[in-house]
């Protein structure tokens, strides 16, 4: 059974959804960020970036346990482990990785910043709010354009 170090963040949910879709058994180990659990040495040994999610799979690729942090790395690992949700053909694989990197490098960070500056910044910074709101709109347009002709990203 895979140990999933989790807190209900967008990246955490990505992994729980994937584990469910793959039908892999897992145990949720809460990492309460409000209490600082992400800074405890035992968690840092698994996720040196002190972010969720992270997993420990006791049945790693060589039969030995493996710990993995960063949601994209976890998703690629799980797809390769099961042979599901990742095309075998090189062109299909490139497309999946391309959109995964788009989500990780563009969607997540930009929407996270938009949310932060709109809802949590200690002071209203119009430049930041406007910049990230415009970028969020641009990102949604990229997604809409892709989905106009495709069932999935």
Predicted regions span which residues?
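Short, local alpha-helical segments
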Residues: 121-124, 144-148
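Solvent-exposed, charged/polar functional surfaces in cytosolic regulatory/catalytic domains
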Residues: 135-138, 142-146
């Amino acid at each position: 059974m895979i140990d999933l170090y989790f807190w209900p963040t967008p990246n955490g949910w990505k992994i729980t959804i994937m584990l469910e879709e793959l039908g892999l058994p897992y145990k949720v180990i809460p990492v309460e960020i409000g209490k600082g659990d992400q800074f405890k040495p035992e968690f840092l040994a698994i996720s040196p970036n002190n972010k969720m999610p992270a997993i420990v799979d006791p049945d790693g690729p060589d039969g030995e346990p493996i710990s993995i942090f960063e949601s994209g790395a976890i998703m690629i690992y799980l797809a390769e482990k099961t042979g599901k949700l990742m095309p075998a053909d090189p062109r299909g694989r490139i497309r999946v990785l391309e959109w995964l990197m788009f989500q990780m490098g563009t969607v997540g960070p930009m929407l996270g910043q938009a949310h932060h500056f709109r809802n949590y910044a200690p002071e209203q910074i119009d430049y930041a709010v406007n910049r990230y709101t415009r970028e969020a709109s641009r990102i949604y347009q990229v997604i809409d354009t892709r989905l106009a002709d495709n069932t999935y990203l």
